[in-house]
Amino acid sequence: MANVSPLNFDRFDRQIRFLGKRAQKLISTTKVLMLGTGGGNSQVSIQLACMGIGELFLVDPDRWAETDRNRVFIPREFVGKRKVSTLKKLIEEYFPDVRVDGIVTKAEYLPDEIYKEADIIVVGTDTISSRIYANRKAIIYRKPALFPYASIYSEKGKLRQFFGVLQVYIPGKTPCFECWKNFDKYRLLAESLDPKRREEFRQRYNLGDELNIPVEASVSALNYIIAGAAVWEILKIITSIDKPIPLQAYNGISRSGRLMERINLKKDPNCPACSLARRLKSNSSLPSREDLIKLGEKR
């Protein structure tokens, strides 16, 4: 937990009315590790800052592009600059009571000390392989972790898919990211290979576009919905105001009338990350590049 100066309860009056002062103190002493600071996680970071979170670790190797501005509220002069440094500056300017650490790196290269120090991990990275890596770290250090994801797909001018998913991992209680197995085997395989080996696999297995890594469509409306759900789950974890939902989804083209639907998910007794067999096999459950390639070939 982060050390903070005395709280200005007036600033947090509206949330204290239902959370209480004790919960606000918990929020203001909590450290959250944000892996990825794109359209979704940047929103989660700002919302947490609004609510007075104690400390944010912002982790991302990338720079802002002009194409980010359709879903992220950033000034034009931020384009071309590091995401973490500019977001850190923005939060510190408007929320000086929040401590912000900006780290320009990938999740895979982040020092273990940061994973250990964080109270909660929010995994908003672009690649499946980095999400698997973060999942293993959450398991090793017994940290609650959230995995928000949004996807839009259209075909021949018709919207086919407009949905978001939020998974919450609570150590020892809920299924982990890899229990779900809901990731594209070809995408995982492509991410695990350098361009030369990717072409070798393409020829060996007679693959076409399956090993291409596409640029996905994205819009602020969908990111904000999933980000809002993530912040609420984070508040549940911090304050115990309600039980976290292990897996929920938003379907923007469904006629069910529900904003977020719960999805039943059970622990996989043979999960390569969190199963008892895996934990007994090794003290370190981090996947190697060869492990990722094998996962991609199997699924």
Residue locations for each model-derived region?
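Extreme N-terminal leader/targeting segments of oxidoreductases
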Residues: 1-25
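A short helix->loop->beta-strand "cap" motif at the edges of active sites that frequently abuts
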Residues: 54, 98, 141-143
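Glycine-rich phosphate-binding loop and adjoining beta1-alpha1-beta2 segment
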Residues: 53-95
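Conserved SAM/SAH-binding loop
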Residues: 104-111
